[in-house]
Design a protein with these regions (language model features):
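Glycine-rich phosphate/pyrophosphate-handling loop used in enzymes and phosphotransfer proteins
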Residues: 1-172
């Protein structure tokens, strides 16, 4: 039947969940089916940028961009999680951060599907956007591109194509 996983696929996902349970991207505690860690949630609230999350152009260089936004300040548990995704091979952390970013910036409802967080579709949120283009980063050393992994949940929630090769990285 369409939309349902086969018995063997369900069993494989359950085994993966048992062997590799979901962890908090910020402190690595086992979460199970909780969307966020009860210990880190208050820490994240302290790092929230407030109701307006657009980056201040007087403090951040945006180049040719019309604007940019970030749900949290780059400090504390947020900084640690990003650095682990970049330098410690935790690609799952980048995806979980992308889900959290999508929920905070666009108000996506986060759902659990077989022990994986998935942001729900956000009707109408993509108006004015054509695609999602992650900032180019090197993936040679780590085997994956952190910004691309973070952008995947956002593209899914907005129903937009993800174009990871639309920009190329240039060293100045």
């Amino acid at each position: 039947m369409a939309g349902y996983y086969s018995r063997s696929a369900q069993l494989a996902r359950q085994m993966r969940q048992l062997l590799f349970p979901r962890r908090c991207p910020f402190c690595r505690r086992v979460l199970g089916t909780l969307p966020l860690c009860e210990v880190c949630t208050p820490r994240l609230e302290e790092l929230r940028r407030g109701p307006v999350m657009r980056l201040d152009v007087s403090r951040h260089y945006l180049g040719a961009l019309d604007g940019a936004a970030a749900p949290y300040r780059y400090e504390g548990v947020v900084r640690s999680a990003i650095l682990r995704a970049k330098y410690e091979g935790e690609s799952w952390t980048a995806v979980e951060l992308g889900v959290e970013m999508t929920a905070r910036l666009f108000g996506a409802e986060v759902e659990m599907h077989f022990a994986e967080l998935v942001p729900g579709l956000i009707p109408g949120a993509a108006i004015g956007y054509d695609c999602i283009v992650p900032v180019p980063a090197t993936s040679r050393r780590r085997g994956y591109n952190v910004p691309e992994r973070m952008a995947q949940p956002l593209a899914h929630a907005l129903g937009l194509p993800l174009l990871p090769k639309a920009l190329c990285r240039v060293r100045a």
